[in-house]
Amino acid sequence: MTKTEINKKDWEINVVVSSEKKLWKAKQDLALSNLAKTLKIKGFRPGKASVEAAKKHLNPEQIQEEAVKLIANDLVKIASESIDESYIVLDSPIYEVEKMSDAELDLKFSYPIYPEFKIKNYKSLKVTLSRAKVSKEDVDSEIEKIREKNALLIKKTKDQGKVAKTDTVNIDYVGKIDGEEFDGGKASSHELVIGSKSFIDNFEDQLIGFKSGDKVEVKVSFPDDYHSSKFAGKKAIFDVKINDVFTKEKPVKNDDLVKFLNNPKLKTLAEMENYFKDLIKNEKDEKSKASFKKDIFEKIMNENEIPVPRLILMKETTNAIREFEKDVKKYGFTVEKYLKMLNMNSKDFVTNLNKESELKLKEALIYTEISKLEKIEAQPEDYDVKYKKFAKLYNVSLDSVKSMITQQQAQVAIVNEKILEFLIKHNAIEKNSVGEEPKLSTTKKVVEPTEEKTRKDSKMSTKKPAAKPAAKPAAATKKPVKK
């Protein structure tokens, strides 16, 4: 027997299933048998206790709790079959015990469903979109990074020259405070880049003008906010010997520079410059697009009520917490230690993650609704354009792109990009980065977001929902017990 209730506050379907008495009894017997194998009872070998003996060492609640786990998959099938197909089920259900005794069991299964809502205002919202230009300086800066990265260190002889900015020096040094050496103040053959600011105060500047073989007395002061209070604000004197001086020899800015990019499609410096121009343009437009997207979605949310299913939000927040735990663990922290460093309590931490998760889900719902309202879908030719773009951008083969990005992943990105184009066309006030007056957008052109970023922005597919629920869940998750 089942009893179904639609909860439009939390957007879930609650189905209470009453188990057949015979099935419930059989599952309790099986649970007792399974538990008996885990017990160590005097007079029996481990795991070999009789059911009768085991029953004396277990309370009824233990047996019933184990039996619920065994029967849940049987009852969830009954619950799923009772759901009206007009509702779109978004995920597998969670379950909790409604009523339980030796003779009977009622389980309640809760399914998150797609909410019913309408976005009424998502046009003419007047949101600024900055159109950045790529300058010659931008391109030159990228070329210079390539030259810096591939520069050779050439040793200067004593007669060739003095220490200058950007030179690398090999030094021995001994530091003293009040005439006494201190921990960490001594090193041999240490390599230091002049101008890197890796040493305190103006230590590096005081070496400028000297040559290899010179001995220099360097006077510095530790900053008042130095991480070790033992040294904070103290004056120190370093006896420094300059062993060697190296200067950078950058590769010449010509066609030969292209080889350092390891891109067989680029042959000349001009091609390399155009490559960086396209890359920088894409990056700048990505930032502009991200800013526009943030502002337009914020306005749409302010203009419309976007309901988020409770269970989906709960799952999204739980996943976010797990991801955060994994991230801090990589750096040797626990969540507790990390939050202590931030002076944040766990309650505020979870609240913040919950808000972020809710925002992401609302964005996904907005994407989905606009795609339905405006009939925005991915066309077969869109996939070819998407794959070719990534192949060109990342200098990989078309087959490699197709193996990395599935058609479903590409579909979400394509539809979301089309929606963003639509929103720009109907809402953007374009502003040139050099300060031109804003003007209403008259073009559909928009820089495409990256695949990974778009997938993160939209956890729900923007494909038009089917007229019936998602595949019937085969398993249910037990609702966490409140402590």
From Swiss-Prot:
SUPFAM superfamilies: FKBP-like, Triger factor/SurA peptide-binding domain-like, Trigger factor ribosome-binding domain. GO terms for molecular function: peptidyl-prolyl cis-trans isomerase activity. The keyword Isomerase applies. InterPro entries: PPIase_dom_sf, PPIase_FKBP_dom, Trig_fac, Trigger_fac_C, Trigger_fac_C_sf, Trigger_fac_ribosome-bd_bac, Trigger_fac_ribosome-bd_sf, Trigger_fact/SurA_dom_sf. It holds the Pfam family FKBP_C. HAMAP family: Trigger_factor_Tig. This is Trigger factor. It comes from Mycoplasma mobile (strain ATCC 43663 / 163K / NCTC 11711). The lineage of its organism: Bacteria, Bacillati, Mycoplasmatota, Mycoplasmoidales, Metamycoplasmataceae.
